[in-house]
């Protein structure tokens, strides 16, 4: 399964490891993805999402119902 946040759409970035001699080798910068269950009070059930920690902070700020409505409007 791809490491993409279901809320923010963030995914990995590609960059370089740089040695002391400034040799460059390719590497991936992975985002901090977590499985998290959120309680939806209106429906009286849990929903399980793969979200980045930044996405969790966004949900804490806006509320899960608002975020879910916003995602469904995009689709």
Curated annotation (Swiss-Prot):
One of its GO terms (cellular component) is cytosolic large ribosomal subunit. GO terms for molecular function: structural constituent of ribosome. The keyword Ribonucleoprotein applies. It holds the Pfam family Ribosomal_L28. One of its GO terms (biological process) is translation. Keywords: Ribonucleoprotein, Ribosomal protein. InterPro entries: Ribosomal_bL28, Ribosomal_bL28/bL31-like_sf, Ribosomal_bL28_bact-type, Ribosomal_bL28_sf. The keyword Ribonucleoprotein applies. Belongs to the bacterial ribosomal protein bL28 family. This is Large ribosomal subunit protein bL28. The lineage of its organism: Bacteria, Pseudomonadati, Pseudomonadota, Gammaproteobacteria, Enterobacterales. The gene is rpmB.
């Amino acid at each position: 399964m791809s490491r993409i946040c279901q809320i923010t759409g963030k995914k990995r970035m590609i960059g370089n490891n740089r040695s002391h001699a400034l040799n460059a080798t390719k590497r991936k910068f992975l985002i901090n993805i977590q499985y998290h269950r959120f309680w939806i009070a209106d429906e009286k059930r849990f929903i399980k999402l793969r979200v980045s920690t930044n996405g969790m902070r966004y949900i804490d700020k806006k509320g899960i119902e608002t975020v879910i409505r916003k995602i469904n409007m995009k689709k």
